[in-house]
From Swiss-Prot:
It holds the Pfam family PIN. GO terms for molecular function: DNA binding; magnesium ion binding; RNA binding; RNA nuclease activity. Its EC number is 3.1.-.-. Toxic component of a type II toxin-antitoxin (TA) system. A sequence-specific endoribonuclease, cleavage occurs after the first AU in the consensus sequence AUA(U/A); RNA secondary structure is probably important in substrate choice. Cuts in 5' and 3' UTRs. The TA system acts as a post-transcriptional regulator of carbon metabolism; in M.smegmatis 3 TA systems (VapB-VapC, MazE-MazF and Phd-Doc) may be involved in monitoring the nutritional supply and physiological state of the cell, linking catabolic with anabolic reactions. It comes from Mycolicibacterium smegmatis (strain ATCC 700084 / mc(2)155). Its cofactor is Mg(2+). Disruption phenotype: The vapB-vapC operon is not essential; cells grow faster than wild-type on rich and minimal glycerol-containing medium. The operon deletion mutants die faster than wild-type under potassium-limiting conditions, which is prevented by overexpression of vapB. The vapB antitoxin gene can be disrupted without causing death, however despite elevated vapC transcription, no VapC protein could be detected, suggesting that RNA processing and translational coupling are important in VapC expression. Belongs to the PINc/VapC protein family. Mg(2+) binds at residues 4, 99. This is Ribonuclease VapC. Disulfide bonds: none annotated. Forms a complex with VapB. Residues 1-124 form the PINc domain. Keywords: DNA-binding, Hydrolase, Magnesium, Metal-binding, Nuclease, RNA-binding, Toxin-antitoxin system.
Length: 129
């Protein structure tokens, strides 16, 4: 699976669906996250909880054995295409910059995407069930 920022923020902030999302992570032996999404998640978490929040993020990723995947040229191209097709102001999905990198890693790797919300459901990316 590819983990999107929305899912990880929900887990780290103990939102009502956090347990369900963590269960999905536990059930999938493949756990990846784009380095672009990692930065986006760190920005969100550290803006709310400071550096201790960032340490909790890193600890969670370590304990869950999530592999951070560097953005390469193929992913950058896929992210660009995602924005062209599904970007904010262009499509109802309204993908933002960070969303495009989660989408791209899922498409390039062939892994389903774990996310919260409805935006990705309006795209052609496979979702974690």
């Amino acid at each position: 699976m590819v983990i999107d920022t929305s899912a990880l923020v929900a887990i780290l902030t103990d939102e009502p669906d956090a347990e369900l999302l963590e269960g999905a992570v536990a059930d999938d032996p493949v756990r990846t996250m784009s380095t672009a999404s990692y930065l986006e998640t760190a920005i969100v978490i550290e803006s709310r909880f400071g550096e201790p929040g960032g340490r909790e993020l890193d600890l969670w990723l370590h304990r869950a054995s999530v592999a951070l995947v560097a953005v390469d040229a193929d992913q950058a191209d896929a992210a660009r295409l995602a924005y062209r097709r599904y970007g904010k102001g262009r499509h109802r999905a309204g993908l933002n910059y960070g969303d495009c990198f989660s989408y791209a890693l899922a498409k390039v790797s062939g892994q389903p995407l774990l996310f919260k919300g409805e935006a990705f459901r309006l795209t052609d990316v496979a979702a974690v069930h």
